[in-house]
Amino acid sequence: MAADGVDERSPLLSASHSGNVTPTAPPYLQESSPRAELPPPYTAIASPGTSGIPVINCRVCQSLINLDGKLHQHVVKCTVCNEATPIKTPPTGKKYVRCPCNCLLICKDTSRRIGCPRPNCRRIINLGPIMLISEEQPAQPALPVQPEGTRVVCGHCGNTFLWMELRFNTLAKCPHCKKISSVGSALPRRRCCAYVTIGMICIFIGVGLTVGTQDFSRRFHATYVSWAIAYLLGLICLIRACYWGAIRVSYPEHGFA
């Protein structure tokens, strides 16, 4: 049952009730446009063998779904294909969207992108002007929308995610593995070289102070503080250089204007 507190990226039917049925569309295929789900009418229809029992057609396989005792729910599950079909309008400010893998999602009216949570789908769906589908009309795809970001392949887990920065050489956090990587290799290379240079300069300064102020330091012990500061700055810069030299790099798949 859809509610305001439900995560917009999660399917409306939990995995515990969905059985072992997998989506009909394989992952990472050419993305089809999503379609808006308008709840069909659920007036009582006399189905064969029953009288006056409310039923509805599944929006995926067109099988009849018995609504007896379920009219208080927002969505119902088909017993044939185990996919969700809405029977009520979504909560205020929300809308239904069906992924090409047939997973029914709920998101905000103003959302422009939504991710399918199914492990073997993980599509990033770009939402554009939605065509409302009536029960009498066949499902029609919505108009495709030009993405404004870049598809990036994570350097840690290899999954693809949408990066909204229009420039490369930035740090990105993968929504799948939650790890940080650099989009492009120019940024870590520049920073690694810069930190190595600064670190070596600080160490050379520390060595020069150590050699040049040995006699002076025997009388003024505060000179040791300047040695320590120079060596410490050099060590910190070299550690940062190691970090930037070892950071994983994520590469863009496609660029969009």
Swiss-Prot record:
Its EC number is 3.1.3.78. Its main location: membrane. The modification Phosphoserine is found at residue 33. GO terms for molecular function: phosphatidylinositol-4,5-bisphosphate 4-phosphatase activity. GO terms for cellular component: late endosome membrane; lysosomal membrane; phagocytic vesicle membrane; plasma membrane. It catalyses: a 1,2-diacyl-sn-glycero-3-phospho-(1D-myo-inositol-4,5-bisphosphate) + H2O = a 1,2-diacyl-sn-glycero-3-phospho-(1D-myo-inositol-5-phosphate) + phosphate. A motif (CX5R motif) lies at residues 107-113. The modification Phosphothreonine is found at residue 22. It comes from the Eukaryota. It holds the Pfam family Tmemb_55A. Disulfide bonds: none annotated. InterPro entries: PtdIns-P2-Ptase. It is found in: Late endosome membrane; Lysosome membrane; Cytoplasmic vesicle, Phagosome membrane; Cell membrane. It is a multi-pass membrane protein. The chain crosses the membrane at residues 192-212, 227-247. Residues 13-23 have a biased composition (Polar residues). Residues 1-43 are annotated as: Disordered. Residues 1-10 have a biased composition (Basic and acidic residues). Keywords: Cell membrane, Cytoplasmic vesicle, Endosome, Hydrolase, Lipid metabolism, Lysosome, Membrane, Phosphoprotein, Transmembrane, Transmembrane helix. GO terms for biological process: negative regulation of phagocytosis; phosphatidylinositol dephosphorylation. Catalyzes the hydrolysis of phosphatidylinositol-4,5-bisphosphate (PtdIns-4,5-P2) to phosphatidylinositol-4-phosphate (PtdIns-4-P). Does not hydrolyze phosphatidylinositol 3,4,5-trisphosphate, phosphatidylinositol 3,4-bisphosphate, inositol 3,5-bisphosphate, inositol 3,4-bisphosphate, phosphatidylinositol 5-monophosphate, phosphatidylinositol 4-monophosphate and phosphatidylinositol 3-monophosphate. Negatively regulates the phagocytosis of large particles by reducing phagosomal phosphatidylinositol 4,5-bisphosphate accumulation during cup formation. This is Type 2 phosphatidylinositol 4,5-bisphosphate 4-phosphatase.
